[in-house]
Amino acid sequence: MKRIVNFIWILLCTVVVHASGSGDGRQVENFDFGWRFSLDPHLNERKAMKQSFDDEGWKYLNLPHDWAVEGYFSEKYPSGPGGGALPGGVGWYRKHFKIDKKDAGKRIYIHFDGAYMNTSVYFNGKKIGWRPYGYIPFEYELTSLVNFDGDNVILVKVDNSDQPNSRWYSGCGIYRNVYLIKTGGVHVVTDGTYIKTTSLTDKAAELEVVTTLCNKTGKQETVEVKSILKDRDGNVVDEAESRPIIAPTTDSNTDIVHTLDVANPHLWNLDDTYMYTLFTEIKIDGFLVDSYETPYGIRNIKFTADKGFFLNGKNMKINGVCLHHDLGCLGAAINNVALHRQLKMLKDMGCNGIRCTHNPPAPELLNMCDTMGFVVMDEAFDMWRRRKTANDYARFFDKWHEVDLKDMVRRDRNHPCIVMWSIGNEVLEQWNSANADTLSLAMANLVLNFGHNEKQEIESGKKNMNTLLTEHLIKIVKDLDQTRPVTAGCNEPSPANNLFKAEGLDIIGYNYHNKNIPDVPKNFPGKPFIITESVSALATRGYYRMPSDSMFIWPKRWDIPFEDATFSCSSYDNCHVPWGSTHEETLDVVKNNDFVAGQFLWTGFDYIGEPTPFGWPARSSFFGVVDLAGFPKDAYYLYQSEWSDKPVLHLFPHWTWDEGDEIDMWCYYNNADEVELFVNGESRGVRKKTEHCYHAVWNKVFYRPGSVKVVARKNGAIVGTKEIFTAGKPRSIRLTADKTVQKADRRDLTYITVEILDQQGHLCPDATDLVRFVISQGNAKIIGVDNGSPISSERFKIDCRRAFYGKCLVVVQNNGDAGKIKLTASSGVLTPASVEIDVIR
């Protein structure tokens, strides 16, 4: 119950992390509702920015919004299957709003958590800003242009027409939250509070608080700055106060430093995510002009070369996954409920780490990792100067990388969940080439301002421009945060890698290359090591290719086109890419090498785009241990059996085949010494896991209709059984809602699992029936359907879905009205089913 309370508390703080308070203090208003939208590459922006422009014909919607996921799949889109085979384009968002005259003395800002990409913002007829990077927050001041008590119009142009620009599905639009901020003339700048633990023992902690203020009053002001630290129960732990004289802000802001003491600190850890809250108050002449809240967890992290990762002095493995930002059938549009569903499934699997691949995440993800107990690798870029796709961020890197990297670190550095920064993923600057890009003159002056000795090192081959660029990025991070190590995801394991030669890269990070891992202590003496990206096994939920001890390495090479008539990958953990491994192989490497701090498995969930090893009609990935709809694949239970203490007894595959088939039966289990298989009551033998094998297997089990059962024993006593029955023909539909109560907020969701059953109530594992959905009662909408198939061309935003290996999914959202929602599912002659949801205020 404590964990749930923590989670709810931190979600409330997501609105006030930037600040709290109303009236005389800061006001932060959610600005997501009541927008109009048009997808039009030919719109005249000079006309659209005018207040008199007629937008009545535009679509009415609320943010966050991803227009691409609403479209049809097509191989003709320039994004290609790698980008999800969904449309790009130019989208326009427009909103009318009023600001009261009582706010005339305040500073007014508009804050975007993220929009993909090339976002231009216009306010009351004037362009006020442009931001190219699609994953970074940005903010503009509106004050001088506001019509107080009159009509105000904001217009946002999001241009994702230059495709391809991403190796995976990016989404399109204002896909993260937007806020309107009102504060005093002297105020804390956005992300302007930095807390760091300067000393920590069992009995005491010392915190340094740096508060960055700006003064936009136009005159010198004497201000009272107060920092108040409170515990979870609201008790004051310590406070500090100062009265600086703040000059009007021109080019620089003013930093105020306070020291706070915490007696007997309650430490943040993965099982007890205790958070303090720092309250910052700014007063002038006794009047509150700004207030600001910052949640903070006190903890100690350490990485060592011989033992890996320590949290609060406890050695532990980082059992992590890589996670892209899309939410399946919801696309890239952030939703707290959908994101929490993903993280809860991973937590239940035993996962304790998230790598944000390969970009700054939504702030909601970090808030949830703080409260749910994950450690995080926060990553800035997928490319630097050398591009990976025709129109990616490389074209903006020279001008924008420093701004974007600083904004990421400033925003995220107070999160206890973050234990390392990553400055890049598989950047091409790891290697030299005769055709290597040269730095711009401005960048050369910035990065290559070296003395005689460094120049000699370059000439002798010890350093080069890419090495110095790496050091430049590291310095940007460490100038803003000295409490966490810096790493990068590298797919070149050689010490000659330009990034590894750089000074200041604290942790060696390999993407894959298991065979090179034993040499890490020799090649990088004294350096901690982590597998920043691992495995890349391939699987289609419900599909099995035998014999299971055969290995399918697909494709033969990443740049060679590959085809297989099934467009499916075996779920036996016997299919992986040539640069990757099986799940069990990497589990074994991490488990049996103390110096390996852990791994980030590629990936936790399937994601839209990058459908390796296939091309069209495949349009989403095969890498996840959970499919795109949120249904676990078999490998999920392998990790749960190794990473968690939850009892696991998972037998697969199903038991509905052609008579006479010979089937390989696998079992993942824990908390048992042995497992025994029975077919129609007859034993097929006892099996045990071995030192380097993490499953039990019975090869070529002769199939006969009936049932297959596994019995687990510990010390001779039965501790678990699992039985699978042969399924008959489809007869009915079963609906299972993940919750039957929603909050009437127009955001809450219910995920409903749809299963096709036979007459006895057994899942039909090969069923492909088309299921239709209707809201038969209540004010709600279907906001997504899916079935986990990476090759389905069915749209996500319709009211029907074909079952895939017996299952599909429908997601229901309320429209803000309290009452009862009823969803009914039907399919031809199958017995229909309904589920009811109560919507409460």
Describe each region flagged by the PLM.
Residues F303, S644-D664, N670-A672, F725-Y751, ...:
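Short S/T/G/P-enriched beta-strand
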Residues L142-S144, V257-L267, V697-Y703, K797-G816:
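Short, hydrophobic beta-strand segments
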Residues F33, S38-D40, G83, G88-D191, ...:
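Accessory beta-strand-rich segments of carbohydrate-active enzymes
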Residues V209-L213, F279-E281, M665-Y669, V711, ...:
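Beta-strand-rich structural segments
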